[in-house]
């Protein structure tokens, strides 16, 4: 049998649609991420860093006592800055040094979140830069959202096909 070429005019005249859809799922978080830290100030840079290290070691020990695993505690920032006084009509005067150390913590047991925050503050943390809630493994939720998007897209495509008589 010979194959026939499709009618070019029919192809050109056929309506085309560009459709998009999205899918969304809502799932309760199963973990939290907190950034917390210690800021110290001393007369010398070495003293500021030593005080900071000692205080941060206490914070990390408190986290470990709360059941936070070592893999869930990560240094996320370390700063050392000179601190100056600026008297009026005079040259700036060095007051000392400020050391700051931040760690990012993953709390996988949300029932322990409040106790963990209390423990780091009691151990000497004087900076808490926010809490973010999330999923330890978001793949299943992402796949569920993708399925919902595909279903929505199929429904839209069928609606357009029916409306145009295709």
Where are these regions (language model features)?
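Short, charged, surface-exposed interaction patches
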Residues: 3-166
